[in-house]
Amino acid sequence: MQRFVSKFVSTPPVPKKFQEIFPKKRTVNKILFQLDTRLTYHEMYPIFLQVSQNTNEENIPWRKKYPYIRSSDIMQMRNVLITLRTQNKFVHKDLLAMEDKLLNIAAELGNNDAISILSFNVIHEYKKENVKSSYEKDIETANEFIKKLYARNHHLTVKLIGDLFFENKTYDKAEKYYQEFLKLENSTKLAGEVHGKLGEIQIKQVNGFLKAEKSWLSCIELLEIERSSRWYFLLARLYMSSEPMKAKALLENCASIGFKECFKTLGFLELNYFNNYERAKEWFKTGMEIMDLECFFGFFDCCVKEENFKGARDCLESVKKLGNDKDKKTMINVFLESRKDSIKLLDKARL
């Protein structure tokens, strides 16, 4: 019964700014279906609206005003915004502020995931030199929360401890906590992220190829491509020399969501392994549009292979113009030196 109280809660007029930034109902419903949320769009919408208008100073009795909500619902609402941001690859500052507000509200309502995330946020802030002195009391409180949550085998806390060690490149400790997490849960999206990072640790180890492959395969099975494109790409690189067809399929998945690194890799794979110059040129052209220098190099090589000397000359001129950029100059000089024979061939073709 309480879940339907939302229908009778009077909602304030919807500000124009909120209408402009908040996603359409159809988009939100699609994400709610993906996340399998407990609340519907109509139950969430007035809360989203209230949160957008709420200032940090306001103390709103959320459970009294919206009796149907749980702290886990607030976290799911935050996940809706995170999913939207991930899929769109666009960050709107007001929606990002709403994510933070929702996290704080969930923590106020006693959600352990929210408390854990906020505690680790404090630790990350503490690492910045300019805030160390002012964060001593906060860091002490955050550490207390983390210790208590870890003692209760709180899943997210175990994972975030692993993440902290991973970021600090203390890989042996990161692996320990990641393995500990996977004993607690092994088939969730969070587990997918852990498998992905675990693979990055394992590939650095002696004879870690098979372990990394297994971890990344588990990762891409559990996570949608938008959240796992990095690990699709790393797995593809693992297969480049031994199983190029597998590598190609994985890279094409990455390309479908605009993962920048894969354009040149796909281009060189088509050029050097499959000898498909036209297809290689298509990938290189896509990379050239985002000014990936190596895609210019690859396109030049394709034109030379096809004896398309005009195309090769035009590409070479474009590369030389990019040489004015100091960051690119060294790479361009190496390219020009390594392609001396091809460049001589272009000069002969003019005669």
Swiss-Prot record:
Subcellular localization, as worded in the UniProt entry: Mitochondrion inner membrane
GO process annotations (BP): protein insertion into mitochondrial inner membrane from matrix
The TPR repeat ranges on this chain: 155-188, 260-294
InterPro entries: TPR-like_helical_dom_sf
Principal location class: mitochondrion
GO cellular component, one term: mitochondrial inner membrane
Keywords recorded for this protein, A-Z: Membrane, Mitochondrion, Mitochondrion inner membrane, Repeat, TPR repeat, Transit peptide
Subunit composition and interactions: Interacts with COX18.
Further details from the record: Present with 736 molecules/cell in log phase SD medium.
Function of the molecule: Required to stabilize mitochondrial cytochrome C oxidase subunit 2 (COX2) and to translocate the C-terminal domain of COX2 through the inner membrane.
Protein name in the entry: Protein MSS2, mitochondrial
Organism: Saccharomyces cerevisiae (strain ATCC 204508 / S288c) (Baker's yeast)
